[in-house]
Amino acid sequence: MLEQVMVLAIILSFLITVILSPLFIPFLRRLKFGQSIREEGPKSHQKKTGTPTMGGIMILLSIVVTTLLMTRKFATLSVETYLLLFVTIGYGLLGFLDDFIKVVMKRNLGLTSRQKLIGQLMIAIVFYFVYQRSGFSTALHIPGTDLSINLGFGYVLLLIFMLVGGSNAVNLTDGLDGLLAGTAAIAFGAYAVLAWNQGQYDIAIFCVSVVGAVLGFLVFNAHPAKVFMGDTGSLALGGAIATVAILTKLEILLVIIGGVFVIETLSVIIQVISFKTTGKRVFRMSPLHHHYELIGWSEWRVVVTFWAVGLLFAMLGIYIEVWI
């Protein structure tokens, strides 16, 4: 029965997004919610100016509806389910505010870095206080072993870092048509397998709901994209994947399963440090996906390559936890 529920959850969330998109995209166009493309980006991206953004609203709606329907009917609406939805919606609303300022108020930078960080920290802190009341453990599991390290208060700092850092890392990856939708589907698919293996079926249902939602979105977001998810989608997905890693106690594995997000973030950090210390850039442009565009790769080639790398990372993560 539960196997059927997982399949139903993917199908339902996929269909919700696919059915909503043809209705919602023209609505975004009428409101003139078009994406602004930064001038310092690859020149090939200038033609994307005006493409409807804030499509992450459809992803969020699909995830929430599917998760609530499926967990209420076939599993339990646990504290973990509510925490997952809280963080996903919370970071989604923060992203929506950022998108709204960029698109509607015509302030290209959106929220300032400080404003965004304060919002991310507030959501992370609320998550911590609710989570710790449910009797959470401060032990950090070592993947592939029966060992764990009790971090004490250090775990609280790790938890907050994961939520803030995870949302930003995933946000950085959302720079090419279909790139984030595909890599997110792979990462959440891997965590669905691991949550199922632990018997945490409510978390597994949430994960497959995300998979279905982003795959449905990919139908319209693949190159050439008809809609972008915006920060509404990318921040929500980043917060969600970090929360899943925390609730399954597979925090370290996020570095592997979310390897593409980690690499993208490291490319930005390396680029900034190199330029500030030596005046030279390591990459043509960061995040890394733009570097490959500027050395001559087509956008589709970059995206498919990153999907493949993400799939390898996901399989490695599952192998380490399940079979070692």
Curated annotation (Swiss-Prot):
One of its GO terms (cellular component) is plasma membrane. It is an enzyme of class 2 (transferase). Its cofactor is Mg(2+). GO terms for molecular function: metal ion binding; phospho-N-acetylmuramoyl-pentapeptide-transferase activity; UDP-N-acetylmuramoyl-L-alanyl-D-glutamyl-meso-2,6-diaminopimelyl-D-alanyl-D-alanine:undecaprenyl-phosphate transferase activity. It is a multi-pass membrane protein. Its EC number is 2.7.8.13. It is found in: Cell membrane. Pfam families: Glycos_transf_4. It catalyses: UDP-N-acetyl-alpha-D-muramoyl-L-alanyl-gamma-D-glutamyl-meso-2,6-diaminopimeloyl-D-alanyl-D-alanine + di-trans,octa-cis-undecaprenyl phosphate = di-trans,octa-cis-undecaprenyl diphospho-N-acetyl-alpha-D-muramoyl-L-alanyl-D-glutamyl-meso-2,6-diaminopimeloyl-D-alanyl-D-alanine + UMP. GO terms for biological process: cell division; cell wall organization; peptidoglycan biosynthetic process; regulation of cell shape. Keywords: Cell cycle, Cell division, Cell membrane, Cell shape, Cell wall biogenesis/degradation, Magnesium, Membrane, Metal-binding, Peptidoglycan synthesis, Transferase, Transmembrane, Transmembrane helix. The chain crosses the membrane at residues 5-25, 50-70, 77-97, 117-137, 147-167, 176-196, 203-223, 227-247, 250-270, 304-324. The keyword Magnesium applies. Pathway: Cell wall biogenesis; peptidoglycan biosynthesis. InterPro entries: Glycosyl_transferase_4, PNAcMuramoyl-5peptid_Trfase, PNAcMuramoyl-5peptid_Trfase_CS. Belongs to the glycosyltransferase 4 family. MraY subfamily. HAMAP family: MraY (MF_00038). Catalyzes the initial step of the lipid cycle reactions in the biosynthesis of the cell wall peptidoglycan: transfers peptidoglycan precursor phospho-MurNAc-pentapeptide from UDP-MurNAc-pentapeptide onto the lipid carrier undecaprenyl phosphate, yielding undecaprenyl-pyrophosphoryl-MurNAc-pentapeptide, known as lipid I. This is Phospho-N-acetylmuramoyl-pentapeptide-transferase. It comes from Geobacillus sp. (strain WCH70).
